[in-house]
Amino acid sequence: MQTLQFLAAPAEAPGISGGQIFGAVTASGAALVAGTGLIIGLKGSDWGPLVINNKRRAAWWGIVTGTIWVAAGGTWAEIANGVGSVPPSLFAGGDFGNPGQGAIALFLTCCAFGPKWGSKTAPPAVIGLAAAVVYGTAGGVWGILVNVVRMLIGIVTGQR
């Protein structure tokens, strides 16, 4: 008597067809890569994506890195929230009144992109990190920016 054997199709291998364009990358992995890229870029790099040679690139790197850190959670979020808690605490309970998170977000954006920082790229990057945290709590157009970055991270990590 002969028996019929069914062979199952192999499981789909991770990769582009599996939705993870860089292989297995988690939110914590994305946070590690973003933080490393920010530090290397600020120290000086000649590789295109990591070249941070002006305030605009430094601020954007800070904003995106801070958003990724918050999305990753854990220690990454604690670092970002620590940096991001400084600007709101300067205005809390003082003689300045309560400007609101939206105004603080606008203030940080002006501070990161407005002044002539010269060759200094660290200040706008740190302000960008703080702004990312405030953007997440401010809502409005600031929340849209944060959600776009988080959606892109979800696509890269395969966690849609």
Residue ranges of model-derived segments:
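Aromatic-anchored segments of alpha-helical transmembrane domains
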Residues: 68-71, 130-140
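N-terminal signal-anchor/start-transfer transmembrane helix
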Residues: 23-49
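Interfacial loop-to-helix junctions that mark the boundaries of transmembrane helices
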Residues: 14-26, 52-53, 88-98
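A generic, lipid-embedded transmembrane alpha helix
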Residues: 58-79
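Alpha-helical transmembrane segments and their helix-start/interface "positive-inside/aromatic belt" motifs
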Residues: 45-62, 117-127
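Alpha-helical transmembrane-segment detector that highlights a single hydrophobic TM helix
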Residues: 80-108
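Short, strongly hydrophobic alpha-helical membrane anchors
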Residues: 1-20, 157-160
